[in-house]
Structure formats: structure tokens, C-alpha cells
From Swiss-Prot:
The name this protein goes by in its record: Shikimate kinase 2
NCBIfam families xrefs: PRK03731.1
Species annotation: Sodalis glossinidius (strain morsitans)
Lineage summary: Bacteria, Pseudomonadati, Pseudomonadota, Gammaproteobacteria, Enterobacterales
Residue numbers spanned by region LID domain: 112-126
Residues binding ATP: 12-17, 120, 155
Amino acid sequence: MTQHLFMVGARGCGKTTVGQALARVLGYAFADTDDMLWRSTGKTVAEIVAKEGWTGFRARESEILTSVTQGNAVVATGGGIILSAANRRFMRARGTVVYLHATAQELSRRLRAYPEDDQRPSLTGKPMIEEIAEVLAAREKLYQEAAHHVLDASQPPDDVVSAILQQLYPSAAS
């Protein structure tokens, strides 16, 4: 049976880093919806948003999400994938959704350490910590609604992977 593990959470929470490590451990394929979007369009998230707006980007993001249907895979999603109720339903119906939760302070620290401005356009135009706190507050309920499992993403990636494995396979951990 095909099994998908969808990683959700705010930008900078570790969806790609943890997702890649988890895929290696499980022997699953790894997919990143932002990367898939770039490969299919030849444009970065910032370029798509500049040309089509957030609505156009979100529509493309949903198309990419539903195209991930073959084989066992860990899928790192964009931070806003949960804004669409259809995306939340799709992920829950097609696999297990893992919410990597981190505080605004931790996310800000990570984003400052590894800036990717061309990949991550501002959503509000506010200073980073304010924007992150505002976006988290607006999305927290949706992340929780989508998730089968919620994990603390402030730990090192290997620890987060171990915690995910313990949640997914509790009998193997004992």
C-alpha cells in the first residue's frame, strides 16, 4: 500500500531537512512541493508570486500537491499549503500529516541564519519576527486541524526524525 507522509509547518521549521532524513531512514522517496513547483515552471516562489499573486501561487501549489501520488514518499509542503481546506483533506486522506511546530523566535533565528529571500517572499511586509508571529497565529489552528501528529521542531533534525518514528511506529520504539 502506498504511504505518504506529509510534512507541514511554517517556513523554516525543517520540513525539507527533516523530510529528507526521514525519507532516507524509511527508504521512501522524497518530494518537496516548492522544488517540484520550481521544476515544473522554471520559476521560484517569489517569481510566481510577483507574476500571479498569492492566489495564483496557491492554485499551482495545490496542483503540485495532488500530483504526488505514486509510491511511498515523504512530502515537504509549502508553509501555506494548509490554507486550502481541500489540501488539508487531501493530505489527511492520502497519508499521515506531521506538523513540525516551532516558535516564532526559533523560526526567525533559522531564517536569519539561512536566508533565502528569493524563495521566501514576505507575506506581510513587516519585520521578520512580527510576520512570523502573525502568520503562525493565523495558521496554527489549520496546522493542528491537518495534522495526525504534532512534533516539536526546535530539536536537532535527527531528534525530530526519531520522534516522528516513535509516533508512527510506537511498538518498534519500545
